[in-house]
Amino acid sequence: MLLVLMAGVFMTALDVFIVNVAIPATARELDAGPDAIQWIVAGFSLAVACGVITAGRLGDLFGRRRLYALGLALFTLASLMCGVAPGVTVLIAGRVAQGLAAALMSPQALAILGTAFTGRARARAFSVYGLTMGVAAVFGQLIGGVLIQADLFGLGWRSCFLVNLPIGALALALLPRLVPESRGTGRARLDIAGMVLVTLALIAAVLPLIQGQAAGWPLWTWLSFAAAAVLFGGFVAYQIGLGRRGGAPLIDPELFRARTFSLGLVAQVVFWTGQASFFLVLALYLQEGHGLSPLNSGVVFVAIGAGYLVTSTSAHHIAARLGRLTVPAGTLLMVAGLALLWAGAGRAGTSGPVSALVPGLIVDGLGMGMALSPLVSTVLATVEPRHAGAASGVLSTAMQVGGALGVALIGVVFYRALAASGGYPHAFRAGLAFLIVVEIVTAALVFALAGGRKVRGSGRR
């Protein structure tokens, strides 16, 4: 079961990072301008962020395996569409389709893990989930660099998308045999009005985060944020009212009465604000500041992966020993890693030894491996099975919004520092200082989230 579920998780996470390596070659071949390039990246993220809440609820109502299979098939076809795209318009459409498919899969995978496993098996399942996410994130750039340099069958950048085809086909073949169907036990009614409201609100919130920095934060971005606030307010009021009238809201307000879930969502947003922006500024520093090729910069990422693999493969054992301190300890270890990286960047500069970055990268990877999967498990620990899909959709949305927010904020910090100093090392260190603050805030939130409860083998706080 885990192998099939993680195939989809791996593909969707990989495509977030691997596309960054493919962009230069893609732009040259398809004659894509800056706006088109931005949409190749942003179209995927926007579709995921706006679709996961609705997809989570659809899984509760109509079957999580069924929705996962639909998403997996659509993602595989969309990858084919991207891989054979004759022009930039088709490629952007394929990326949006990939995002919608990822939105279908992501909450179903989390919901199935949360309902199919209990006790230590549940902790191990979430450890595998975290390991898969981390490996895709950390090694995505390396995998992309290898594929492009290998230029298999003359496919070049297209192989970064076509690599999903055999993975998707195999997972689809095994899915009916290995993954049981599951669904919520609540009222089988679909909240159409709630779906429309939350989708519009997320578009209004995420679109300016994605495009605001490059556009110079024009008036429309601030008007969009204001519209998002109004739409979210209307959505919350409608959900509460619908629940009181005996209806079936898209997101049951009871979910947020659990302190673990509501505070955990905030922690997830802040955590992913740091993760998405860290990978971005590190790649910029290595490729633009040090002039490394995508493949060579991907090799540097192996240092993070080494640390991550050490702790993520034994995350449930660490949780059993450290209890409620597991995630806080992981985030504080990440702070230490970023501080070491800040010092190492001062020595590496633009022409010094890149090896000066390695100690900080390893320590950051160790902390990331300790924090990622136990944090997800903690947030979902108190969710009733009937709400598993909706809760997983909300959690996935928090991750996407955090990532978009992180990229927007780090863009302001990094590029302002770059403009002021003219040097990538200074801009990178300014970005790291921002990330250290983000991780300290994350540590404070997860300390509060622990709330004095001890984690056992199940990963519960």
PLM region spans:
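Transmembrane-helix bundle of Major Facilitator Superfamily
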Residues: 1-173
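12-transmembrane solute porter fold
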Residues: 1-21, 30, 221-222, 231, ...
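Membrane-interface helix caps of multi-pass small-molecule transporters
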Residues: 25, 57, 61-62, 84, ...
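Membrane-helix boundary and inter-helical linker elements of multi-pass secondary transporters
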Residues: 28-29, 35, 60-61, 83-86, ...
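Hydrophobic/small/kink-forming positions within alpha-helical transmembrane segments
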Residues: 46-50, 80, 134, 138, ...
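Transmembrane-helix signature of multi-pass solute transporters
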Residues: 74-84, 97, 101, 167-174, ...
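Glycine/proline-centered helix-kink
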Residues: 107, 133, 137-145, 202, ...
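Hydrophobic transmembrane-helix bundles of small-molecule transporters
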Residues: 149-266, 274, 292-293, 299-300, ...
